[in-house]
């Protein structure tokens, strides 16, 4: 059977099914509402029947959410590969952050610098990670983020420091300023209030703090009892997300209280969760280094595997405002960009590259697009 014809039949069947549910529920509501508004009891309807109906409706609603999500999201839709700007002489990219203007910030294993790229992957700026002074010393940033005021902040695990880059310096090219000491800083992010978030890997903690204009730390707070926290990111509804090595991914609210773990809420078994982020719609996305996957955890419905192939060692993870998913693939020494929605959800989105475009070569249709 022709695939297009078969797909049309499936679409018609799905639409008829959903429409039948809508019509039946509307009809039942119209008949039941005036009867239930009179306080004369429930007729012959038993408590058990109400419970059964409630459970069935709950299941149907969950199934409809899953259908909606599966229609809305794509899997393994790789549209671009950005080579590691540090070249093959360094380790693969590990930390990644995408700013509101679409700029991409990248750190790599064993590379003493932060690369700032355009959304197309072209290098815009290079920030060498060097402490200027009598004896200039390079350091290796583990992860990177951008503060609300636009300053680049990194975690320096080797020197147990958090550093912020300041353009207002006595040095013509700016300088890195140490703003705090952490036992083993690994991941770094910014919460909804503008505070910097840092994971303390060996201590099992996440520290949050604000900075004043003189780079003085204010309003410190610590979340403890985590198991090897790796990456941290702004979460949905103003909270934050943190991944635990060989463990789970946990969501905290803006009062630093645990809301839930993804493993418990969704019944999902992680291998080695690494990069985490939330998209503009409030969905949570998690890279799994061991399983070489990326999963999306929707607000309602079951988890969806967005990337199930083509990753060697996914570490850092971020979403762009244009609705693209960027994965730092340390094992493949590049950044991989996926289009995970069926169509742009916002009119302000930048044009997306379509793998179905007739202008693409066969190599590009498979998802590999050299820059």
Predicted regions and their residues:
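Structural signal for beta-propeller blades
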Residues: 112-115, 160-162, 204-206, 248-250, ...
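Short loop/turn segments that connect beta-strands within beta-propeller blades
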Residues: 118-122, 166-170, 210-214, 253-257, ...
């Amino acid at each position: 059977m022709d695939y297009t014809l078969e797909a049309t039949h499936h679409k018609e069947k799905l639409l008829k099914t959903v429409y039948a549910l809508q019509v039946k529920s509307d009809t039942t509501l119209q008949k039941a509402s005036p009867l239930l508004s009179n306080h004369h009891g429930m007729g012959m309807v038993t408590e058990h029947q109400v419970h059964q109906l409630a459970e069935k409706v709950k299941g149907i609603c969950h199934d409809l959410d899953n259908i909606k999500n599966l229609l809305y999201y794509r899997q393994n839709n790789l549209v671009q590969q950005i080579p590691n700007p540090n070249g093959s002489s360094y380790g693969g990219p590990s930390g990644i952050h995408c700013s509101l203007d679409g700029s991409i910030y990248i750190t790599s294993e064993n590379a003493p610098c932060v690369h700032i790229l355009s959304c197309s992957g072209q290098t815009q700026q290079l920030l060498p990670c060097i402490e200027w002074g009598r004896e200039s010393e390079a350091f290796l940033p583990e992860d990177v983020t951008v503060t609300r005021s636009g300053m680049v902040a990194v975690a320096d695990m080797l020197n147990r420091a958090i550093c912020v880059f300041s353009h207002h310096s006595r040095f013509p090219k700016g300088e890195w300023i140490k703003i705090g000491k952490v036992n083993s800083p690994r991941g770094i992010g910014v919460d909804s209030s503008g505070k910097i978030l840092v994971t303390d890997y060996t201590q099992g903690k996440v520290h949050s703090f604000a900075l004043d204009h003189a780079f003085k730390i204010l309003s410190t707070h610590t979340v403890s009892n985590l198991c090897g926290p790796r990456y941290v990111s702004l979460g949905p509804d103003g909270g934050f997300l943190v991944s635990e090595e060989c463990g789970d991914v946990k969501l905290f609210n803006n009062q630093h209280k645990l809301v839930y773990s993804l493993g418990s809420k969704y019944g999902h078994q992680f291998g080695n969760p690494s990069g985490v982020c939330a998209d503009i719609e409030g969905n949570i996305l998690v890279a799994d280094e061991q399983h070489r996957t990326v999963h999306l955890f929707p607000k309602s419905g079951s988890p969806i595997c967005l990337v199930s192939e083509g990753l060697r060692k996914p570490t850092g993870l971020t979403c762009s405002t244009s609705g693209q998913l960027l994965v730092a693939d340390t094992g493949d020494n590049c950044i991989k960009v996926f289009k995970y929605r069926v169509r742009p959800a916002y009119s302000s989105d930048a044009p997306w590259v379509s793998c179905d475009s007739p202008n693409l070569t066969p190599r590009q249709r498979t998802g590999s697009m050299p820059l």
